C-alpha cells in the first residue's frame, strides 16, 4: 500500500533541494525583462533621502560598492584613501607573519616621506604621527589615521559623489528597492516548521534565485491571541540588526491571510537537532566553541543596541548551508532604554535565570545565564538543572525552578574539561554582579575561546568545523508537522488594516542590496552595455520600472 504521507514528504523535499540548485535557463529568461527605474524617476528620492555618510557609503552594500567605484576615479587623494582603508583592513584580519608583512607594507606605502601613496589629506598631529609611526605604536597611530581618513571622505569626496553618475545609479537602485512585494514575488516550497502563530516555509525569489525562509503569521490567530504587538516588535528589531550571527530580515509583506517575514534560510538544522538527533547526544567540543563564539558575538550585537534576547537556547540557534550559525526567533526580544530594567517573566523554563524566576529587575544578564545552560547542554546532551535522566523520569517545572534558584550544576559528563566547566560556572553565577558578561567584561576574552580570532570570525573568514550535507533536509518530515485548526469568528477593522500596513514595508535595505550583489543582478542591471528586453507589461514600459513578477 502506498504511503501518501511519505510520498508527500519526498516530493516536498525533492522540490526544495532542487530549488537550491537553481535553474539558470529560467533565471536568464526572467532577468532579460528587468530594468532599473529611469534617473528622472528618482528626483523626489534625491531630495528626501537622508544624506548620512555611514548609512549610504558604509552600511548599505550597493551604496558602499558605488562609493568605492567613485573613489577609484575621484582623484589621487580619494584613490589613496580607499587603498589605505583596504590595506589597513587586511592587516586587521591577518595573522602571524602575514600580519607583520601587512604592517610593513602600510608603513612603506603610506607613511614614508615622499611615497607616491602618502596620505596628503592628513593634517596636524595625526599627519606628524603617521610619518613617524613605528612597529611599536602602529596600532594606536593607525587607529587615529583611520578616523582621520574617514573624516576626509565625509567631506569634499562625499559631497562630490552626490553630484556624480555613481550616486545617480545608487538612487536608481534605491527606487528599485521600493518596489511592492507580495507572495507573487516568490516561489514557495516545503514547510520547515510551525509555531504558535503560523508556519515557516522555504521560498525562492523568482528574479534572483535567492532562497529564504518565510515566517507566515496567521492574521486571525495573531488577533485572537493579541500577538500583534509582539509580531511588530520582532519585525522592527530584525530590521535594525546587522550581524552575521543573527538571522537577517530581507522582506516584510502581507497577504489576505498572513503577515510574512522573509529571512535568512538556515537549512543546516538547529543546535537542538544536532545535540539529540545525530550520533551520540551532544556535540564535539571544537564545534561547541566555534558556535558559542558566534552566538556570543550575536548576543553582544543585540546588547549594543540595548536589546535583550530572552530566548537563548540551542533550538533557536540555526545553521546555514555552510555550517555557520545564527540566532533566530526574536519574538521575546525586548528593547530596554539605557539605565532602565524590567522584571517581566519570559523565556523557556530550563534556561531562565534566577532573576527572571524571582521577577526581580534585569537587563542583559539573562542572556548570559541562558548561554551557560546552552553550552552545558551541547556538551552533555541534557540541560544543567534537569539532569541526564530527564527523559526517563520527567522533572516537573517547579523542581527545575527550585534547582535553578538553590543548587549548583553537576559536571559528571566525561566531555567536561576544566576550561569548559569554568566558563559555564561563570555564566551560571546566581548573583548578576558576579556573572560573566555582567561586570563590564567581554565573555569572549575567557580562555575557553583562545583558539578563536574574533576579528576574522566577524569577517566570516574562519571555516566552520562542520558543514551540512547538501542533499540532506535538516527538518522534520512534513507529515510530522501538526496542522492548525481553523480560526472562526475573527473579523478585521480599520485598526487592523493600519497595523497590517505598518508591518508590510517591503524590502529591507541591507539584506536586499546584498542579495542583488550576491546573485549577480547588480552587475547585470548596472552594465552600461546591457540591452534591455522588450519584455514586460505596458505599465512597466511607461514607468521605466522593472518587470517584477
Curated annotation (Swiss-Prot):
Domain AGC-kinase C-terminal intervals: 450-515
Biased amino acid composition, Basic and acidic residues: 527-543
PTM field: Phosphorylation at Ser-33 is regulated by light and activated by cAMP.
Domain of life: Eukaryota
Domain annotation RGS: ranges: 53-171
Lipid moiety-binding residues (S-geranylgeranyl cysteine): 546
The UniProt record lists the keyword rRNA processing: no
EC number: 2.7.11.14
Residues that make up the propeptide removed upon maturation: 547-549
GO CC annotation terms, alphabetical: cytoplasm; membrane
Reported consequences of knocking out the gene: Impaired cone response recovery and delayed dark adaptation.
Catalytic site: 311 (proton acceptor)
Keyword Lipoprotein: yes
Membrane-topology descriptor: Lipid-anchor
Residues binding ATP: 192-200, 215
Keywords (A to Z) from UniProt: ATP-binding, Kinase, Lipoprotein, Membrane, Methylation, Nucleotide-binding, Phosphoprotein, Prenylation, Sensory transduction, Serine/threonine-protein kinase, Transferase, Vision
Residue pairs linked by disulfide bridges in the UniProt entry: none
Additional note from the record: Although the protein is present in a diversity of vertebrates ranging from bony fish to mammals, the mouse and rat orthologous proteins do not exist.
Protein name per its UniProtKB record: Rhodopsin kinase grk7a
Amino acid at each position: 500500500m502506498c504511503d501518501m504521507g511519505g510520498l508527500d514528504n519526498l516530493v516536498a523535499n525533492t522540490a526544495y533541494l532542487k530549488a537550491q540548485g537553481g535553474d539558470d535557463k529560467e533565471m536568464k529568461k526572467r532577468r532579460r525583462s528587468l530594468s532599473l527605474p529611469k534617473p528622472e524617476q528618482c528626483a523626489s528620492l534625491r531630495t528626501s533621502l537622508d544624506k548620512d555618510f555611514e548609512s549610504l557609503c558604509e552600511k548599505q552594500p550597493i551604496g558602499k560598492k558605488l562609493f568605492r567605484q567613485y573613489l577609484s576615479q575621484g582623484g589621487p587623494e580619494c584613490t589613496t584613501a580607499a587603498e589605505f582603508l583596504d590595506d589597513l583592513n587586511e592587516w586587521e584580519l591577518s595573522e602571524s607573519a602575514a600580519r607583520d608583512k601587512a604592517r610593513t607594507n602600510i608603513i612603506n606605502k603610506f607613511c614614508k616621506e615622499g611615497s607616491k601613496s602618502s596620505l596628503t589629506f592628513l593634517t596636524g598631529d595625526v599627519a606628524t604621527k603617521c610619518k613617524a609611526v613605528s612597529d611599536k605604536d602602529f596600532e594606536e597611530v593607525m587607529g587615529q589615521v583611520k578616523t582621520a581618513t574617514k573624516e576626509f571622505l565625509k567631506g569634499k569626496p562625499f559631497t562630490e559623489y552626490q553630484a556624480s553618475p555613481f550616486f545617480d545609479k545608487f538612487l536608481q537602485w534605491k527606487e528599485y528597492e521600493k518596489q511592492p512585494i507580495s507572495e507573487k514575488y516568490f516561489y514557495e516550497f516545503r514547510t520547515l516548521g510551525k509555531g504558535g502563530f503560523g508556519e515557516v516555509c522555504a521560498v525562492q525569489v523568482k528574479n534572483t534565485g535567492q532562497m529564504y525562509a518565510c515566517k507566515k503569521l496567521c492574521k486571525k490567530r495573531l488577533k485572537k491571541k493579541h500577538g500583534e504587538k509582539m509580531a511588530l516588535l520582532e519585525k522592527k528589531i530584525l530590521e535594525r540588526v546587522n550581524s552575521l550571527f543573527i538571522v537577517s530580515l530581507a522582506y516584510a509583506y502581507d497577504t489576505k491571510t498572513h503577515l510574512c517575514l522573509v529571512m535568512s534560510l538556515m537549512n543546516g538544522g538547529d543546535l537542538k537537532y544536532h545535540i539529540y538527533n545525530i550520533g551520540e547526544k551532544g556535540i564535539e567540543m571544537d564545534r561547541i566553541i566555534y558556535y558559542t563564539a558566534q552566538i556570543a558575538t550575536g548576543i553582544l550585537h543585540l546588547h549594543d543596541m540595548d536589546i535583550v534576547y530572552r530566548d537563548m537556547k540551542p533550538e533557536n540557534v540555526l545553521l546555514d548551508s555552510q555550517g555557520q550559525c545564527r540566532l533566530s526567533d526574536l519574538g521575546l526580544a525586548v528593547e530596554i532604554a539605557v539605565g532602565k530594567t524590567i522584571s517581566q517573566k519570559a523565556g523557556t523554563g530550563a534556561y531562565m535565570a534566577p532573576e527572571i524566576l524571582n521577577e526581580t529587575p534585569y537587563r542583559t544578564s539573562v542572556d548570559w545565564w541562558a548561554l551557560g545552560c546552552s553550552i552545558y547542554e551541547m556538551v552533555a546532551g541534557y540541560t544543567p538543572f534537569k539532569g541526564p535522566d530527564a527523559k526517563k523520569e520527567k522533572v516537573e517545572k517547579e523542581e527545575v525552578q527550585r534547582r535553578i534558584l538553590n543548587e549548583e550544576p553537576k559536571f559528571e559528563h566525561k566531555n567536561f574539561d576544566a576550561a569548559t566547566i569554568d566558563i559555564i560556572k561563570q555564566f551560571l553565577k546566581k548573583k548578576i554582579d558576579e556573572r560573566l558578561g555582567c561586570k563590564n567584561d567581554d565573555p569572549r576574552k575567557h580562555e575557553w575561546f583562545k583558539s578563536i580570532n574574533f576579528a576574522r570570525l566577524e569577517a566570516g573568514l574562519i571555516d566552520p568545523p562542520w558543514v551540512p550535507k547538501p542533499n540532506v533536509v535538516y527538518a522534520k518530515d512534513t507529515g510530522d508537522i501538526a496542522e492548525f485548526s481553523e480560526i472562526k469568528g475573527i473579523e478585521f477593522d480599520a485598526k487592523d488594516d493600519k497595523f497590517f500596513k505598518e508591518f508590510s514595508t517591503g524590502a529591507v535595505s541591507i539584506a536586499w542590496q546584498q542579495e542583488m550583489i550576491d546573485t549577480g543582478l547588480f552587475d547585470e542591471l548596472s552594465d552600461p552595455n546591457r540591452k534591455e528586453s522588450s519584455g514586460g507589461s505596458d505599465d512597466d514600459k511607461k514607468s521605466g520600472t522593472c518587470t517584477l513578477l
